[in-house]
Design a protein with these regions (language model features):
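Extracellular beta-solenoid/beta-roll
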Residues: 1-81, 98-125, 200, 234, ...
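Extracellular/periplasmic ectodomains of large secreted or surface enzymes and adhesion receptors
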Residues: 127-131, 136-181, 186-191
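Transmembrane beta-strand segments of Gram-negative outer membrane beta-barrel proteins
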Residues: 157-167, 171, 332, 339, ...
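Secreted peptidase-domain scaffold signal
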Residues: 169, 273-274
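Outer membrane beta-barrel translocator domains of Type V secretion systems
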Residues: 199, 537-621
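Short secondary-structure subsegments characteristic of cysteine-rich extracellular domains
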Residues: 213-214, 479-494, 610-621
Length: 621
């Protein structure tokens, strides 16, 4: 307790007169007043400095206060002309809507030409302050508040924090609806600039945008981003979610930025574009719209959740990192080069393959929704680890291709290419549902021999319909007679409306192989046969002899032999040459007589199967 007034007399020019008052046990009671004379300075740092008398600050005198560390009360407080009130606003933990610096029983009088000066070491040099100090409406308190909440024309939403400095905002930020705002601020958007760190440790309610231009923004409470419309992260900026859940409308991040999920949960109601880095663990949930990810996220080990009606688009393995994908909407994998998909993908959503590259999937592909191969190739597993894709519907578009080992659990629609060929024949692709041909192409490899020749096969457990072209590559074999043929397509269900059409000629040795539907109980299957007809299998019946498909070139071989046999036939007289004689009358040498050889032949032949017929006409003169 101090009894009496404290007076700092006026001092001459270049003199000093300073007083520092600190509180003891959070309270300093002075039974008197405080008069600060011309040129003198008083530093008050007590949180509860109470003067029972009056406080006056003369011309060129100053009072120095710190926000959060000073709360000075007096009967009356007067700041005279050209007096100075210096306020340090460098409070690191802003946990109140406002801080009271001065309070008075009867009022605070501030001369028009007095000076209230704020300084803040947390601010980047030259930056606008986020703090505003003024009298309250009753003129009995001098308070400092966040300019965010100022409704008198100075509202401001930018926090420009100096490098290595940290500011924690622990009060809730709501929309400032005042028509008078500073420097074009919309009253509802937060901007973090400067290379320092801003922490939002309260649940907020603002509805504008959140933009991190530089430095770090740390979220230390649920919904610290309020109801943010757009979240912008500029190059070099970082957002640390610090384990808390947040919901925003749209995410827009630039290359070189970092979004650290850090065990938190970020919900996007309208997708966005992510060119920066996503790191940490936790979850990123897409409730609606499309999120297009192009950044390197190899350090993200969390979960992407794509909800119904939402869309996630990625183009490289790094875009997904090592994250799981729980897909109930649409996932687009746009690969322009080879991509071994190692991420676990589940859910009943649809998967779209675009881009000219090949996508190789293994047993981590657990989705059950539709798979649409629009461009490029989807490769199922490998020879040692075949994959049965769980999709209920696989669509191969005109520029798409399905290949590999295993099959699809559901239906298959083919407008593009289904490629069963590998390094050797014998691959089997299984369709668990129905197959629909839409003028697509099936590629097979076959050894051209008898019925038991090695071949690739398409096995359809359900029904088959539509038209499909089939191209067969010969993989060895010298040709042989077939009985039923080499089965290449097997349909367990109905195939009445299916048509598989051979695209190119298949020859081996003396045989032509053709693709033909089976007969009788085999009428739902397609075979490569070297026979003209497939017999209808009868129980306990002995197969009849049937003619095989002979190559038409054989007829030309026979005709060539016949021509060669006639071409060089001559007679004895021709071999002897012409006879010469000398005329008795003239003594000249002459040729004797005339000689001619004329021979013609006509022949016809055919094989006993009547497949090959040849006719030859030969004339020799």
């Amino acid at each position: 307790m101090i009894n009496g007034d404290i007076k700092l007399a006026s001092i001459p020019v270049n003199g000093t007169n300073e007083l520092i008052i600190k509180n003891i046990n959070n309270a300093t009671a002075i039974n008197g007043g405080l008069m600060i004379g011309n040129g003198s300075s008083v530093y008050l740092s007590g949180k509860n400095s109470i003067f029972n008398g009056n406080i006056s600050i003369d011309e060129d005198a100053s009072m120095n206060l710190s926000v959060g560390n000073a709360n000075v009360h007096a009967n009356t407080i007067t700041l005279k002309s050209d007096s100075w009130l210096n306020i340090d606003t460098s409070i690191k933990n802003w946990t109140q809507d406002y801080y009271t610096l001065l309070s008075s029983d009867t009022g605070i009088s501030i001369a028009d030409n007095s000076h209230i000066v704020q300084y803040n070491v947390l601010l980047t040099e030259g930056a606008e302050s986020y703090v505003y100090t003024s009298l309250n409406d009753d003129d009995n308190k001098l308070i400092s508040m966040l300019r965010w909440n100022n409704t008198k024309g100075m509202g401001y939403g930018t926090f420009n924090i100096e490098k290595d400095a940290t500011l924690n905002i622990g009060v809730s930020l709501s929309d400032n609806l005042s028509p008078l705002l500073y420097d074009g601020w919309d009253g509802k958007s937060l901007t973090k600039s400067g290379n320092g760190t801003l922490i939002l440790s309260a649940t907020n309610n603002y509805t504008g945008n959140t933009e991190v231009k530089s430095g770090v923004l740390i979220l230390a409470a649920p919904d610290a981003l309020g109801r943010t419309e757009y979240l912008y992260l500029s190059r070099g900026a970082e957002l640390d979610m610090n384990g808390y859940p947040q919901t925003i409308s749209k995410l827009l991040t630039a290359a070189g930025s970092v979004l650290n999920i850090h065990g938190g949960s970020l919900i996007l109601n309208n997708g966005g574009e992510s060119a920066g880095t996503i790191a940490g663990d936790g979850s990123l949930n897409i409730n609606g719209g499309m999120l297009d990810i192009t950044g390197n996220n190899r350090n993200f080990s969390g979960v992407f959740t794509v909800n119904k009606g939402a869309h996630l688009a990625v183009s490289t393995a790094d875009n997904l990192g090592t994250a799981f994908v729980d897909n109930y909407g649409t996932l687009t994998l746009n690969s322009t080069s080879a991509w071994q998909l190692t991420n676990n993908i589940s859910g009943y959503g649809n998967v779209r393959k675009t881009g000219a590259g090949a996508l190789n999937i293994s047993d981590n592909a657990k989705w059950s929704g539709m798979t649409d191969i629009i461009q490029g190739t989807v490769i199922l597993g490998n020879a040692d680890s075949p994959v049965m894709l769980g999709s209920n519907q696989v669509i191969v578009e005109e520029q798409g291709k399905l290949s590999g080992f295993g099959g699809v659990a559901g239906n298959l629609s083919n407008s593009g290419i289904v490629d069963l060929t590998t390094y050797m024949p014998g691959n089997i692709l299984t369709v668990g549902g129905n197959y629909t041909g839409r003028n697509g192409l099936i590629l097979l490899q076959t050894e051209t021999g008898g019925d038991n020749s090695k071949t690739d096969r398409l096995v359809i457990k359900g029904n088959a319909s539509g038209s499909t072209r089939v191209a067969v590559t010969q993989a060895g074999g010298t040709g042989a007679e077939t009985l039923n043929g080499i089965e290449v397509i097997h349909v367990s269900g109905n195939a009445d409306n299916a048509e598989f059409i051979q695209t190119e000629r298949i020859t081996a040795g003396a045989y032509d192989y053709i693709l033909k539907r089976g007969q009788g109980i085999n009428s739902t299957n397609w075979y490569l046969i070297s026979r003209k007809d497939i017999p209808v299998p009868q129980p306990e019946a002995v197969p009849e002899n049937h003619d095989n498909n002979l190559r038409p070139e054989a007829g030309s071989y026979v005709a060539s032999i016949a021509a060669a046999n006639n071409l060089f036939v001559t007679n004895l007289y021709e071999r002897q040459g012409q006879e010469l004689y000398i005329s008795h009358m003239t003594g000249e040498e002459n040729e004797a007589g005339i000689w001619m050889y004329n021979k013609g032949k006509h022949n016809r032949w055919r094989d006993n199967s009547s497949q090959l017929r040849t006719r030859g006409i030969a004339t020799l003169c």
